[in-house]
């Protein structure tokens, strides 16, 4: 879908993107605050941000309860949600074009004028407890926060987070909202048919009842190499594994595009070098690899599930193919195929207003950078074998990594798999 992007900076310190999608019949809203778990005041109330997010659509200045607010918000089919991460709290909504202003007003009252109540707090503490307990039955959810911890990130696992819920008091919720929900800490992306509406939207956002504050700095952790770690689960008859490598700098956009193509070559399809080879031999039903750029560090991750009896053979393939990349063994034919795939996926990724909004929001909420949708094809075509290989070599050269797994197997088996990877460094 054709669209144009304008960045606006409001007098109250808020910033955001207004994305005009001519002819769109849907409006999409996203509002982000640096208000996630890392900004909670004390570790013993770590889950405060998450519980507050659950309470965000409860009683407020205009509605006495969550049920009353929900009934009004959704009466014409509109959707809303919120989510919390280590750094962010994000409020999202989608609605029919004809009611965009009503929905924006309803978001305003929920975000700016909540009336946090003790009854709601107790209910949402129970709901969050149920949510996190459910995650403990998902071995991938159990694994990756532990990987973060092992590398040195100052985060809690879901089990640790569960133990902090009882400590949260109503004043903790109120304090976290006052601290984080300020106009200077707010970023937004609004997408839809905006012709003739931009000034009204800006005026509405300028009137939001948020105090001035600050855009919080992203905390920095010192990352380190860690020993292979097994999370023992007697019910885990296979191995859920994660191999994470860290590089002590933010890789640039060109390097990230190159790593995306490299990961496609390695694990992206049924005919890929690692996943495709494993599937052909019946060794693993599914696995992935991906690279990401953080504020101070970048990561290259491999993960998946494998039966214990076939894990050695899968890791032999992983080690062999990563070694081949380090040795420069990527063909122009493989590069061209990966570029063609990336170009197609890019074009398919802007079919809806929400997809367009999401293309911009992740990066914009992170560091304020406005991606250029039209230049992505050029960036993909400019990917080179040399950049892929050099970036992969830099990850290996940093030697900051860990292998972790969830299984009923033993530590000795995981250490044996780790030894196969160790030879790459």
What are these regions (language model features)?
Residues 1-26:
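N- or domain-start disorder-to-order transition segments that initiate the globular core
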Residues 9, 225-233, 404:
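Short amphipathic
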Residues 3-7, 219, 229:
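Short, acidic/polar N-cap/turn motifs at the starts of alpha helices
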Residues 236-238, 244-247:
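Acidic, glycine-rich loop-and-beta core segments that form the ion-binding/anion-interacting portion
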Residues 22-25, 236-237, 397:
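Short strand-connecting beta-turns/loops that link adjacent beta-strands
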Residues 62, 67-216, 220-222, 247-250, ...:
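Charge-rich, well-structured scaffold segments of protease-associated domains
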Residues 20-73, 243, 253-266, 274, ...:
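Active/ligand-binding-proximal structured segments within catalytic/core domains
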């Amino acid at each position: 879908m054709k669209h144009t992007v304008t960045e606006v900076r409001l007098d109250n310190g808020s910033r955001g993107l207004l994305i005009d999608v001519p002819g769109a019949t849907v409006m999409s809203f996203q509002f982000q605050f640096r208000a996630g778990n890392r900004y909670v005041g004390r570790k013993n109330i770590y889950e405060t941000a998450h519980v507050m997010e659950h309470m965000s659509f409860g009683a407020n200045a205009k509605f006495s309860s969550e049920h009353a607010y929900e009934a009004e918000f959704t009466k014409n089919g509109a959707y809303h949600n919120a989510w919390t991460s280590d750094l962010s709290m994000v409020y999202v909504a989608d609605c029919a074009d004809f009611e965009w202003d009503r929905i924006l007003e309803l978001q305003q009252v929920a975000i700016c004028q909540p009336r946090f109540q003790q009854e709601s707090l107790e209910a949402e503490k129970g709901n969050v407890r149920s949510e996190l307990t459910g995650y403990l039955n998902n071995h991938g959810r159990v694994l990756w926060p532990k990987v973060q911890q092992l590398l040195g990130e100052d985060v809690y696992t879901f089990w640790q987070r569960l133990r902090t819920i009882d400590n949260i008091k109503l004043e903790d919720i109120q304090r976290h909202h006052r601290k984080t929900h300020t106009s200077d800490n707010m970023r937004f992306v609004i997408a839809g048919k905006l012709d003739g509406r931009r000034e009204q939207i800006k005026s509405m956002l300028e009137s939001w009842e948020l105090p001035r504050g600050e855009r919080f700095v992203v905390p920095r952790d010192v990352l380190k190499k860690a020993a292979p770690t097994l999370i023992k689960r007697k019910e885990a008859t296979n191995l859920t594994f994660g191999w994470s490598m860290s590089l002590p700098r933010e890789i640039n956009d060109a390097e990230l595009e190159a790593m995306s193509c490299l990961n496609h070559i390695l694990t992206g399809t049924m005919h890929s070098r690692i996943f495709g080879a494993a599937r052909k031999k019946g060794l693993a039903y599914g696995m992935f690899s991906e690279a990401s750029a953080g504020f101070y560090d970048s990561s290259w991750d491999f993960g998946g599930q494998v039966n214990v009896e076939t894990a050695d053979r899968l890791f032999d393939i992983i080690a062999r193919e990563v070694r081949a990349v380090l040795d420069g063994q990527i063909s122009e034919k493989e590069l061209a195929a990966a570029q063609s795939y990336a170009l197609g996926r890019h074009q398919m990724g802007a079919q809806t207003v929400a997809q367009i909004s999401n293309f911009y929001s992740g990066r914009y909420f992170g560091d304020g950078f406005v991606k250029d949708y039209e230049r992505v094809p050029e960036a993909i075509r400019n990917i080179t074998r040399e950049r892929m290989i050099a970036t992969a070599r830099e990850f290996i050269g940093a030697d900051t990594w860990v292998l972790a797994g969830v299984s009923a197997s033993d530590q000795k088996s995981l250490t044996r798999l780790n030894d196969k990877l160790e030879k790459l460094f």
